[in-house]
Regions:
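Short glycine/proline-enriched coil/turn segments at helix->beta-strand junctions
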Residues: 85-88, 123-124
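Short SAM/SAH-binding signature in class I
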Residues: 88-94
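Conserved S-adenosyl-L-methionine
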Residues: 1-85, 100, 104-106
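Conserved Class I SAM-dependent methyltransferase catalytic core
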Residues: 42-46, 50-59, 99-165
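Residues immediately flanking
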Residues: 80, 95, 133
Length: 165
């Protein structure tokens, strides 16, 4: 949405400010028309995604259907280890974590595999990975560029940036 200059609240039918006493429908229409005129097309292939869960892929595709040029975003059901090289990309990942999965089994192995994928197939990229549990950050095996605390529900997680060389 940001790349395409799609205004926030584009799917809303009504805003609270429309009930204010000095609200002007003419001014609002002018602002809305100007914002809509600044929308630009999303080139095919600029954004893509994947997940191993069919439900997640289906939800992403459904959400994209209502978005301007959402059909230019490819979402596939596949394991990240099977993806082709993502050199000089921006990678955003919200991988599984123990609390969300209900189990800590094999997560250390998973995060090591994620780190190996980033090192081997993502040269020149920046990766932003959300960790619901901080103890797995070191399992990736890459030096962090920075870590930012992010609360998601009861999770005291971290968004971590990796610069892959």
């Amino acid at each position: 949405m940001r790349y395409s200059n799609i205004p926030a609240g584009v799917f809303r039918n009504r805003f609270g400010f429309e009930s204010l006493p000095d609200f002007s429908r003419a001014v609002w229409q002018q602002v809305k028309t100007e914002a809509d005129g600044n929308i630009r097309n999303l080139p095919p292939g600029l954004i893509g995604g994947s997940d191993v869960a069919a439900e997640a892929v289906s939800a992403a595709r459904t959400n994209l259907m209502g978005l301007h040029n959402g059909n230019n975003v490819s979402v596939e059901r596949t394991d990240f280890k099977k993806l082709s090289a993502l050199k000089e990309h921006v990678i955003v990942a919200n991988p599984p974590y123990g609390i969300r999965m209900g189990s800590d089994e094999n997560l250390a192995v998973f995060y090591k595999a994620l780190g190996d994928f980033l090192k081997q197939k993502c040269k020149g990229s920046a990766a932003f990975v959300y960790f619901g549990e901080r103890q797995y950050i070191k399992k990736v095996g890459l030096k962090t560029a920075w870590k930012k605390p992010i609360k998601a529900g009861r999770l005291d997680g971290r968004l971590v940036k990796y610069e892959i060389y």
